Regions:
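Phosphate/diphosphate ligand-binding glycine-rich loop within oxidoreductases
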Residues: 65-145, 159
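Short acidic/histidine-rich motifs immediately flanking catalytic phosphotransfer sites
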Residues: 61-67, 86-89, 215-220, 243-246
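Oxidoreductase and adenylate-handling cofactor-binding alpha/beta cores
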Residues: 127-143, 183-187, 315-323
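Rossmann-like adenosine-cofactor binding region
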Residues: 76-80, 194-288
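Rossmann-like dinucleotide-binding domain for NAD(H)/NADP(H)
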Residues: 111, 116, 245-333
Length: 333
């Protein structure tokens, strides 16, 4: 790779451990670079300022690394073996919260590999994207724009949100932020969560039975983390409770839904969805979701806004600095 596309600090300090960012999205280059001075005399860092999902390229770029900052790609079992068994990587710092779908955590733990994540860095970003998807389902602005551009002035009837029931499955930082936005729209918010610690003065109704959230809501928004107890927690049973005309939004993790269940429900054609997260990313060209006109798709970008990028990059750099100085900041247990 051309040297102009690499940013490297303290290259002469071969006594220091090497951190590599093998791929990155353009909007994150400057925020990351701004935090590199925090690693002075702690570690060298090498950032490749482009984005690729080519495994061979990623492995070549990380062959001398002791820590890898992971942005936008999965650490498959093959990559994990290459980096930690045949390579020297002892720490992965992920630019995201839910890492269970990005790396085999049990294997990493067994090998003594540190895995770090970032927390609450983009609660507002994800919540705003979730609500943007809700608005798109309700008002179909994208389709209206396409209509006008092709000379069609017929329009589409929208769906008003005031007074509608929004069901939140999950009520952490993101879910609470969505609830605040929904309160501003005058929506009635129903919440299911395994544990709710205070409602922060929000106008919400707690529902003990998740099935009832699906049955009663006009719009459902998912905000559960991916944990051992949440993988596949939403099944065809809940999805079948959705009323005709209702909508579901997922900006959390695809794996919290039983594999294939949402696609099958959408193929019946009487409900709509907006999805930002998928079982396989990038979404394969032959995925049946691509052929459905009752679903809005975005490429796992709910977390990506200017403020979230600043928060994320600082936490990632702090995590690797902590690792190399004996701390455990943002270490995934």
């Amino acid at each position: 790779m051309n040297e102009r596309n690499i940013i490297e600090t303290q290259p002469e300090r071969t006594d220091l451990p090497l951190i590599v960012i093998p791929v990155i999205v353009e909007s994150m280059i400057e925020p990351f670079a701004a935090n590199f001075p925090l690693l002075h005399d702690i570690a060298r860092i090498r950032m490749h300022c482009d984005f690729t999902l080519d495994t061979d390229t990623i492995l070549e770029r990380t062959k001398d690394a002791e820590a890898v900052i992971v942005i936008g790609f999965h650490i498959t079992d093959d990559i994990l073996d290459a980096m930690t068994v045949r390579g020297h990587v002892s720490c992965f710092a992920f630019g995201g919260t839910g890492v269970a779908s990005y790396i085999n955590l049990p294997v990493a733990r067994e090998r003594g590999i540190r895995v770090c994540n970032v927390v609450h860095y983009g609660d507002h970003a994800v919540a705003e994207h979730a609500f943007a998807l809700i608005m798109e389902l309700a008002r179909q602005v994208g389709r209206l724009d396409a209509q006008v551009r092709r000379g069609d002035w017929s329009g589409i009837d929208g769906i008003g949100l005031h007074g509608k029931k929004l069901g939140l499955v999950g009520f952490g930082g993101i879910g609470r932020t969505v609830a605040r936005i929904a309160n501003g729209f005058g929506m009635k918010t129903l919440v299911w969560n395994s544990h709710v610690h205070g409602i922060d003065g929000l106008d919400i109704t707690l529902i003990d039975d998740m099935d009832e959230v699906f049955a009663q809501s006009d719009i459902i928004s998912l905000h559960l983390p991916l944990l051992d107890g949440t993988a596949g927690i939403i099944t065809s049973r809940q999805l079948d409770r959705m009323r005709p005309g209702s909508m579901i939004v997922n900006t959390a993790r695809a794996e919290i839904i039983e594999p294939g269940a949402l696609t099958r429900r959408l193929q019946r054609g009487d409900v709509r969805a907006a999805i930002d997260v998928f079982d396989h990313e990038p979404l394969p060209m032959d995925d049946p979701l691509r052929s459905l006109d009752n679903v809005v798709l975005t490429p796992h970008v709910a977390w990506r806004d200017d403020e979230a990028c600043v928060n994320l990059t600082r936490q990632v750099i702090d995590a690797v600095a902590s690792y190399f100085t004996g701390g455990d900041y943002n270490a995934v247990p």
